[in-house]
Amino acid sequence: MISFENDYLEGAHEKVLKRLVDTNLVQASGYGFDQFTAQAIEKIKDTIDCPNATIRFLVGGTQTNQVVINSMLESYEGVISADTGHVAVHEGGAIEYSGHKVITIPSKEGKVSASDVETYMETFKSDFKKDHMVFPGMVYISYPTEYGTLYSKSELEELCKVCKQYQLPLFMDGARLGYGLMSDQSDMTIKDIAKYCDVFYIGGTKIGALCGEAIVFTKNNEPKQFTTRIKHHGALLAKGRLTGIQFLELFTDNLYFNISRHAIEMANKMKDGFINKGYRLYFDSPTNQQFFILSNEKIAELEQKVKFAVWEKYDDQHRVVRFATSWATTEENLNKLLELI
């Protein structure tokens, strides 16, 4: 059986594995204070054109979101998110477990707008009972969104302006950052993201690494005693070299972006194949996550031969399904899928 269930079905890119093997017996300090992590940090700083950035490595996306949000908010604050945001619907209440409310606002195709954030803030400010409420202390977005859609450069710039107006840090979840940046429809570079976001992370788990996410604080704004805060969450990896080595390789010779581009090419071919066979798109996603509307009967038939995600109900006879490509998707498996549909 072939699978397009998600974008973390395989292990790691062969070059990442080779770098891990080649450095395996080299002694290195722990907790991220090793020579490999230091080199990876410098490569990322050069790539994002942000020499004053502070970069830290964690293992997974939910862990990263929880650590960043919990560390940057006061105890009485919550984080603003799209109602479809990962922290709101797919993290098992991890943010709430750390003591912070996820304040959801309406989204369109997975995105929140600057005007909606501004409206929420003005409504909050004018509420005479606001001292009895959770204060908004941060804005969380993801790139791409949960529906594979992208913020434009102008949309991100407007969000940045509104966040500055209300002194809200802008935090971008970049679990699939490479897939967003390498999309044909992206008008941004990673340098733009570093410019407009106060903190973001570069996803490795879904893009070529065994595991790992690189947190980037762009405005000399790393929380105080951040190492200790990471430790509080049980997220401080003793063998920090493991994430450092992987990102060192991913940011050598544009590997991260090249393998991200492959996923987009596979997704575009998939989309064209579905459309040519008469299937409808739920959203016209420009990234590696593709959403289609399939009949219940077709879903039952396909589930016998291919794995994919049933996303949500469309109507009584149809469901929205997601097929995801990745850096490791092969032409062979994609062709098999297109034959099956």
Describe each PLM feature range.
Residues 13-61, 83-88, 94:
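Conserved N-terminal alpha-helix of the aminotransferase class I/II PLP-enzyme fold
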Residues 71-89, 118:
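Conserved PLP-anchoring active-site segment centered on the Schiff-base-forming lysine
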Residues 74-76, 268-269, 273-341:
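Conserved C-terminal alpha-helix-loop-beta "cap" of PLP-dependent enzymes
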Residues 99-144, 151-158:
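PLP-dependent aminotransferase-class I/II
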Residues 102-103, 170-172, 281, 308:
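Hydrophobic beta-strand scaffold residues
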Residues 108, 135, 142, 150, ...:
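Active-site C-terminal subdomain of aminotransferase-like
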Residues 151-183:
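Catalytic PLP-binding core of fold-type I/II PLP enzymes
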